[in-house]
């Protein structure tokens, strides 16, 4: 015997959709932030990300353009450095996102968020390294300034990372300083 199918398929039960939380609005500039303001702190972290991205590019270009008797050592060191700067940028960016703030959408936005770095103006190896050395020292100082701010807003993960990043920056600067003294 034939049993006809229903004329209309039963409608599936609607599954309730949970609301997706919206990310925080763009943080205020540090000069407009109140003491202990998370948005101002995040803006400074984004500025540090911009600085790290500039350092990555600088280390990579020096890596490509460096010439000298110690080429092999410097070439390898700078490769490690630009790879480290990419990892540092990514880690700090992930910390920012974990606090539900957005990163800039493009290179221009990222560059606008940062103070910029000292630029290399010579192809002479020692001069390129001297500029990079100064920028690494500045990176270390920036992390020292951000570490207590991270503690103030309760971002202990970022606080710990600032201490780690500070050590990495000053160690790399020491390597370059020792190279410049002997070469």
Feature map (PLM): residue ranges:
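Short, charged, low-complexity amphipathic alpha-helix
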Residues: 32-47
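Acidic/histidine-rich alpha-helical segments that form the ligand environment
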Residues: 44-45, 111-164
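Conserved alpha-helical segments that form or flank metal/cofactor-binding pockets of metalloenzymes
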Residues: 72-109
């Amino acid at each position: 015997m034939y049993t006809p199918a229903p004329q209309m398929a039963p409608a599936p039960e609607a599954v309730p959709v949970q609301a997706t939380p919206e990310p925080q609005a763009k943080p205020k500039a540090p000069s407009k932030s109140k003491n202990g303001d998370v948005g101002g702190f995040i803006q400074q972290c984004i500025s540090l990300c911009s600085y790290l991205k500039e350092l990555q590019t600088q280390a990579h270009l020096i890596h490509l353009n460096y010439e000298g008797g110690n080429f092999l050592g410097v070439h390898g060191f700078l490769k490690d450095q630009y790879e480290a700067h990419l990892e540092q940028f990514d880690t700090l960016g992930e910390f920012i996102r974990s606090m539900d703030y957005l990163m800039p959408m493009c290179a221009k936005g990222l560059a606008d968020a940062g103070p910029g770095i000292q630029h290399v103006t010579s192809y002479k190896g020692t001069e390129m390294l001297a500029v990079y050395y100064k920028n690494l020292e500045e990176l270390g100082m920036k992390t020292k300034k951000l570490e207590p701010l991270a503690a103030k807003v309760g971002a202990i993960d970022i606080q710990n990372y600032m201490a780690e990043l500070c050590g990495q920056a000053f160690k790399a600067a020491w390597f370059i300083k020792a190279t410049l003294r002997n070469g």
